[in-house]
Regions:
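C-terminal helical cap/extension that packs against the catalytic core
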Residues: 3, 34-35, 67-123
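Active-site catalytic pocket residues across diverse enzymes, especially alpha/beta-hydrolases
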Residues: 53, 115, 138-142
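Short, active-site-adjacent cap segments at secondary-structure transitions
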Residues: 130-132
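Flexible, gly/pro- and Lys/Arg-enriched active-site loops
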Residues: 7, 16, 20-23, 74, ...
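Active-site-proximal loop/hinge segments that shape catalytic or ion-binding/gating pockets
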Residues: 127
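Nucleotide phosphate-binding/pyrophosphate-handling subdomain across enzymes
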Residues: 1-81
């Protein structure tokens, strides 16, 4: 379709390469640690997301209407550590597991400690609401947005 509009191949390639979708494999640097935000909230998305990493520290939050067990089945095998957090109003709480944090930012801060020790990134996922809550603070100047 873009070719039909007369766009040059180089412009199409550059656009695809530089495209960004907030909350989808979005990368930040926070206190020297790479933090990835991704709203993966179903098993196929979680499977695709997990393939992008060899290991990570996981911050996870979800809503009861989602296939949480299916999502975690793909994410947990590569998680060096896990922190569960409330994704938003009506989201799952402590029943997700422990350690559980009401405030996702506190879960992220806690995950940073482990990440600084081993150099692995932090991956926050499971809900676009969780990602949105974290992203709001990161783009407010607390973290550096990376390409």
């Amino acid at each position: 379709a873009l070719r039909l509009l007369g766009l040059p191949e180089a412009a199409i390639a550059r656009g695809l390469r530089e495209a960004r979708h907030p909350g989808r494999m979005e990368r930040f640097l926070l206190k020297g640690v790479e933090v990835y935000l991704d709203g993966a909230h179903n098993p196929p998305a979680a499977e695709a997301l997990a393939r992008e990493f060899s290991a990570y520290h996981l911050v996870f939050g979800a809503f009861p209407r989602k296939d949480v067990k299916g999502v975690l089945a793909h994410l947990l095998p590569k998680a060096r550590s896990v922190r569960y957090a409330r994704a938003g109003e009506g989201a799952l709480g402590g029943e997700l597991g422990t350690p559980f944090f009401e405030d996702p930012w506190e879960a992220l801060e806690d995950a940073l400690a482990g990440a600084r020790e081993d150099g692995l990134p932090v991956l926050a996922t499971g809900s676009l609401y969780l990602v949105g809550r974290l992203r709001e603070r990161l783009v407010a100047g607390l973290g550096e947005d990376l390409p």
